[in-house]
Amino acid sequence: VSGANLGPDWERLPDGTAYRQAARVVVFGDDGRVLLARGHDADQPERSWYFTIGGGIEPGESPRQAAVRELAEEAGLWVDPQVLVGPVLTRQARFDFFAETVRQDEVFFLAHVPAGSAVSTDGWTAVERGFMDEVCWWEAGDLAQVTREIFPAQLPALVRQWRSGWDGTVIHLGLQDERTTIASPATTRQASSASEEGHHR
């Protein structure tokens, strides 16, 4: 059984939890900047976060193929699947999505593109347009100062580590609970949002 309005790549586990496997990409420009998406919770408009490009793995796709497709759809950037680095990281995430708790098993890759590569959101699906706000380039060193949520939470440190290359170690973060009940206070995010806007484009 599919995950209701979540999309066709979601299924229901025996306990009713919506679940999918996903592939994600940490994208670096040749200038060292990193590409992130920003999204919001439609049911909690005050909650906004940054996350990596990526999404569900479709039937017949490998994680690498899914990562390339998602990068094209969400950011308008095309890369050869063979130039992706990794997988560099895996994790299981539990989070709120369209008013329910879901679980997603994720595998991460690295991609490198020319500095200043223009991004496009023309390929966003209806589901993505319902919660995604923008795709933008960040200076890697600035991520540590962001007080909005970032997923995974370890991303700022990982970006600093991977910016100069990957040492071949696959990091396994295990299960990470990102539901609202354990999230950072919304007031902290709201207070910082004005200073973040425009700083990272």
Language model features by range: what are they?
Residues V1-D30:
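Acidic, metal-coordinating catalytic segment for phosphate/diphosphate chemistry
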Residues R20, P45-R47, T52, V102-E106:
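Short connector loops at helix/strand junctions that flank enzyme active sites
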Residues R33-V34:
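Entry beta-strands of beta-propeller and related beta-repeat scaffolds
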Residues S48, G116-R201:
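Nudix hydrolase/Nudix homology domain
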Residues I57-R148, R189:
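Unchanged
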